Amino acid sequence: MNNRQINSLWSSIIIEELIRQGADFFCISPGSRSTPLTVAIARNPKARWKMFADERSAAFFALGYGRATARPAVLICTSGTAVANYFPAIVEASMDFQPILVLSADRPFELLECGANQTIRQENIFGSYTRWHMQLPVPSKEIPLKALLSTIAHAVVKTIGSPAGPVHLNQPFREPLEPEIPDLKDAWAAPLQEWLENGKPSGKSALPEKEPDAETLSLLREALAVAKEPLIIAGNMQKPEEAEAVEQLALELQIPLYTDFSSGLRLKSTTRPWQLAFASPHFTRHFKPDLVLHFGGHIIAKQPAAAIREWKPKHYIVVKNHANRLSPDHNVTLSIEASIASTAAKLKGCRTLSSGIINAATEEFFRRAEEEIDAECIGNKPVTEISAARLVSRLITAQQRLFLSNSMPVRDMDNFACSSHPHAIRSAINRGASGIDGIISTAAGFAEGDGKSTTLIIGDIAFLHDLNALSLLGAMTVPLQIIVLNNNGGGIFSFLPIAEYRDLMETHFATPQNYSIRSAAETFGLDYACPQTNQEFTRCYLEATGSPRSIIIELRSNRAENLHHHRALQARIETLTNHLYQGFIEKISEQPN
């Protein structure tokens, strides 16, 4: 075989084995050095692929795809800075345990660090953010092809294993790079004849979740048995069955359940918006759990963590399905690495000493607090960032998907969403590193992977940050409804102490942009709307979710007014809490010690 044939066969084997292992979606960015890989994908009828002019957008798209499918999309790029553009998405995938596989093309050894064009040190470029990395050899007949097969199979296992996350394979090629059909009867390929004919993966790996041991379960049951005021927290969950198991445990034991938006439970009618209660000092002063049982990852709101620091519960137990530390305040008393669903299921039947008063006392608070939020959504009132979150949470259906940007959109949905759905609404956020970069790309990948119409709520700065991702939407198989909360700047800074420094706030933090979102929609051939009232927004959103076309819905607001709306609503809820919890205090005092 000549070098073209060697490169072609080598690349075809890589791509075929990836597909057989379940990694059959490829995000390709054009480039010369990656020619053998790109050709192998193009000529494999089982490969699904999408082209990306921007590697950064490609990586976030792959991240979203992995979130939706729990399978890695494969990133293909040329040598040089192309692979470096993947870094932000790789960090997010690593920190939030999402599968993603990078297959970067590279120059061979003799072209490294000698001034050769478009050449950087690519090996292990992502450092500790990968679950596994491997510098593959230059394709050569000296390398047994079975070794290549087992390496590819292992790479897929590492990206979907426990914990899931990024894997990087760096593949150098020597020129010439153009394809040429290889001779499959060559002695080099002979050991693969059975693999070439049977269509099966070279090998499979079993990946069972770790079960909680008897001693750990005994410790948990003992702690629950003596708890007088327990609290369960449903944090970031990767699987619906995890969230369902935690919800069922809380319902059976009649323990208050704090459902973070990232748990997937926040919009269900069986849950309560404890976020509103935890935002009230009156509540946290009088509800002091002696046991906190936290399932899953970290949560969005700061108030529960602050309350736990103040309460100093006897037991603060975290159950998670990975070995990474989850104790930002260094106050966890027991950390358990085990299957979340299995652990929750095996705790059913436990008994606690809980009086149940907190559940009864808060029902009236929840009802009246929800009425206060609903008042923001009256039809002829101007649509606000609060009412937009509330209305979307009410109007979205189980057949649709929801993706939230970081910063204010995820906080408003976490705080003000309507818990009214009989079934969980599938949703996602990039909450690993909590950046605002790549949000449109991630939402697009999530929609593509899930195959469902998806609503994205995003701020204007995050929208601008990933503007070129709008070019992806025209070729999407499902539409996106992009709701842009345009307050002309970084609205979250209005809620932070830096807002008091008016000489710095606008120029160095809020950074207003003054770009036309309508023009962006026109540039990329997308539908556009700009409703003014809650009624107009409701009508516009319902029409958009029934359309096969993607749309940008711009909601214009003023940062100062938005801050006022939030503080006024919180003040009304705080007054309500103060009034209602006077009765709560009296009931607590009547309980025997």
Swiss-Prot record:
Listed name of the protein: 2-succinyl-5-enolpyruvyl-6-hydroxy-3-cyclohexene-1-carboxylate synthase
Subunit text: Homodimer.
Reactions accelerated catalytically: isochorismate + 2-oxoglutarate + H(+) = 5-enolpyruvoyl-6-hydroxy-2-succinyl-cyclohex-3-ene-1-carboxylate + CO2
Source organism of this protein record: Pelodictyon phaeoclathratiforme (strain DSM 5477 / BU-1)
Leader sequence residues: none
GO function term, MF aspect, one: 2-succinyl-5-enolpyruvyl-6-hydroxy-3-cyclohexene-1-carboxylic-acid synthase activity
Cofactor binding, per record: Binds 1 thiamine pyrophosphate per subunit.
Keywords: Magnesium, Manganese, Menaquinone biosynthesis, Metal-binding, Thiamine pyrophosphate, Transferase
